């Protein structure tokens, strides 16, 4: 492994055995920097990072579990395998070369070629046929990565499923496509469109079940439906059972047209009054609301007329039937009545108004003046109260009532309002 040292050995015989020769030998032993510098390369040869050139060319054997390719590279036979394919396309498709000699049992000792048929090889793309891990370098071998077989023609049918190949053979669709059929290389390209054609008719059969459930849920809840006639559905609810009789596979437009026609016919025929009675308006005009709560500025309607009109509440009413609407609220009878001539009702309404009038509560603490002072500012109070009706409950009616035993609290703010002009 080490280079010979021809320079150190002949030094002693040339000089002979003399003290000078010994000294010369010692001098030569101290001088040989170049000759003694050779052991470090010999020691460095053990280092894997700096192997000497002659050792690179000759390797004793590949590492355990690896095989050496003709290029000198080592590979794992469990991942890669050596195959040799003839460049001539006219000859047989695929060959495999075994080890020349020294192979384990099951591998022939002489180099030979195995003719592998492409169909069995493609149908069984299992692990490489090498049962061993270490093999002596043999004849001409090539390093190829071991991937799934190149021919995706027969294997492409496996992606469709177990019933994919059989269904493809039975369908007459591939013969119709005569353009790509005569070309032998693109059989996998032909196989891809038929699975799409097979799956397309199968897709409509699956969604109807899920769509029927969704359609049934939407039919029970007319709120989220985008149709523009929710009131008609309430009136023609009797015609709903006939809608699910149609198959769920129909388009939504047809179903909408059938529903619309059935609802229009049933609404004109029956037109139940109970539906109108149950249907309450969600929006009320501001004028009607102000008339309902007696807050309309400049309203000169008599108080008794509101209570005299009975009848059901209609959304088109302009205020004549508003008394019935306010009575539909869950409020005490004192607050639902407009007859302020009753002292109890007037007292209750005035107390409710003063809960929200914080100025009046703060200004009630000053001493109350005599009755003559309360009579003078009464008309001024009625005018100002009517001007600010949006913030207070029923102040206009309260100002018209004369000071009585039930209206003991109003004199406080009246005195203040009368004192403001001074």
Swiss-Prot record:
Coiled-coil intervals, chain numbering: none
Compositional bias segments (type: Basic residues): 383-400
InterPro entries in the record: PRR22
Region of interest (Disordered), ranges: 1-35, 306-325, 363-422
Pfam family, one: PRR22
Signal peptide: none
Bias type Basic and acidic residues, positions: 413-422
Protein name (record): Proline-rich protein 22
Natural source organism: Homo sapiens (Human)
């Amino acid at each position: 492994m080490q280079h010979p040292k021809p320079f150190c050995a002949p030094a002693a015989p040339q000089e002979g055995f003399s003290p000078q020769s010994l000294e010369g030998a010692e001098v030569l032993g101290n001088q040989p920097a170049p000759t003694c510098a050779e052991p470090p390369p010999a020691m460095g040869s053990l280092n894997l990072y700096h192997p000497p050139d002659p050792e690179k060319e000759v390797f004793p054997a590949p590492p355990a579990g690896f095989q050496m390719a003709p290029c000198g590279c080592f590979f794992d036979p469990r991942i890669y395998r050596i195959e040799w394919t003839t460049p001539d396309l006219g000859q047989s498709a695929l060959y495999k070369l075994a080890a020349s000699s020294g192979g384990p049992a099951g591998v022939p000792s002489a180099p030979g070629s195995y003719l592998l048929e492409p169909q069995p090889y493609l149908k069984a793309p299992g692990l490489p046929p090498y049962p061993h891990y270490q093999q002596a370098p043999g004849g001409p071998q090539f390093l190829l990565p071991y991937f799934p077989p190149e021919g995706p023609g027969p294997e492409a049918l496996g992606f469709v499923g177990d019933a994919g190949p059989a269904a493809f053979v039975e369908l007459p669709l591939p013969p119709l496509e005569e353009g790509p059929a005569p070309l032998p290389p693109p059989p996998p390209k032909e196989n891809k469109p038929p699975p799409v054609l097979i799956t397309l008719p199968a897709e409509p059969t699956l969604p109807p079940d899920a769509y029927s459930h969704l359609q049934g849920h939407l039919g029970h809840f007319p709120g989220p439906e985008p149709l523009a006639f929710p009131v008609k559905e309430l009136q023609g609810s009797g015609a709903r059972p006939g809608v699910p009789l149609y198959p769920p596979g129909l388009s939504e437009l047809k179903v909408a047209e059938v529903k619309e026609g059935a609802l229009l016919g049933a609404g004109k025929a029956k037109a139940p009054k109970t539906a109108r009675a149950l249907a309450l308006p969600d929006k009320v005009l501001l004028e009607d609301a102000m008339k309902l709560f007696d807050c309309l500025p400049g309203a000169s309607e008599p108080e008794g007329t509101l209570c005299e009109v009975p009848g059901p509440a209609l959304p088109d009413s302009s205020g004549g039937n508003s008394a019935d609407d306010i009575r539909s609220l869950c409020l005490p009878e004192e607050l639902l009545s407009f007859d302020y001539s009753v002292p109890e009702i007037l007292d209750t309404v005035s107390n409710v108004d003063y809960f929200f009038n914080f100025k009046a509560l703060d200004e009630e603490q000053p001493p109350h003046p005599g009755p003559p002072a309360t009579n003078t500012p009464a008309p001024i109070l009625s005018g100002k109260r009517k001007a600010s009706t949006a913030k207070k409950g029923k102040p206009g009616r309260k100002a018209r009532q004369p000071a009585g035993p039930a209206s003991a609290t109003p004199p406080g703010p009246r005195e203040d309002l009368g004192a403001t002009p001074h």
